[in-house]
Amino acid sequence: MKKFIFKRLIQIIPIILGITFLSFALMHTAAGDAVDTLYDSNSSGVSEQIKEERRAELGLDQPFMVQYSKWLKGVLTGDMGISYISGKPVFETFISKLPATIYLMLTSIVLTLLIAVPLGILAARYRNRLLDYCIRFLSFMGNSMPNFFVSLLLIYFFALKLKVLPVMGYGRSPLVSVILPTLTLTISMASKYLRQIRVTVLEEMNKDYVLGGKARGIRDNVIFYRSILKSSMLTIITLLALSIGSLLGGTAIVESIFMWDGVGKLAVDSITMRDYPMIQAYVIWMSFIYVAVNLIADIAYQYLDPRIRLNQED
C-alpha cells in the first residue's frame, strides 16, 4: 500500500508541471493581457507608454519562458506572486475564498447523498413499478436542466415570487444564503447519482452470489444490506470523487449567479481580468485536488474490494 501511494504521489509532479505550463502558454497566446484589460475597463485615453511601463513593472514584457521560470521558481519557494488586479498576495486571496467553496461543497454532497442513495435503492428494489417510473422521471428531468437554468428558476420562485430566500451573497447569513446554490447543485448531482446507484444495485442483485445466498435460505434484507450495498459503494465512491473534485474547484456558473464568494467566482473574475498569477494558482489547486481525490478513491477501492488489492500487489 505504501509503495502504491508513493508511486501515485510521484506521478503528481509531472502532471501538475505539464498542466501549469500548458495553461501558462494558452494565457500568453491570447490577445491582450492584464494591463490592457485593467486600463481599458478603468481608464480612457491612457498612453501606450504608461501601459508599457506597467508591463515592465509586472514583468509582462519578458519572454514567455522567462516569465514561466520566474513564476515556477516563486511557487517552489512558497511565493505564488501578487495579483495583478488587487495587488494582494495570491496565496492569501485564494485561501480566503476556500471556506465558502468548502461550505457549499459539504452541504451539496450531504444533501445529494441523503436524496440519491435511498431513492436509487428504492428504484432498484421496485424495478418497473410505479415508484421506479416516478423516480426515473425525476432523474431524467434533473439531468435535462443545466445548472444556470435551475439557478434562475429557484431565484424566480423562492427569491422573487415567494420572497423567502435571499438571491445572492455569503457573508450576512450563510445558513440561509447557502440554500439556493445547494439546491441547484443537488438537483444536478442527485439526478446523476440516482441513475448510477439504481443501475449498480440492479447489477449486483442479479449476480450469482445473491442467488446463492437465497438458495441457502439467507433473508433478502440480510443479503441486500450486507452484500449488495457494500459492493455498490464502489460506484458511490467514484461519483463522490468526481463531485468533490469539481466542487472544491468551485462551480463557476453557480457561484457567479448567486454571487457566492468562493473559488469558482474568483477564477471567473481572474480569467476575465487576465490576472495570470491568480489563474495559475487556480490551475495548481484544481490539478492537486483531482489527483488527490482520485488517490483517496483508489485507496478506498482497495479496502472495499479485495480483488483490486490483490491486483495492486501483483
List each language-model region with its residue ranges:
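Hydrophobic alpha-helical transmembrane segments of membrane transport/permease proteins
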Residues: 16-69, 162-180
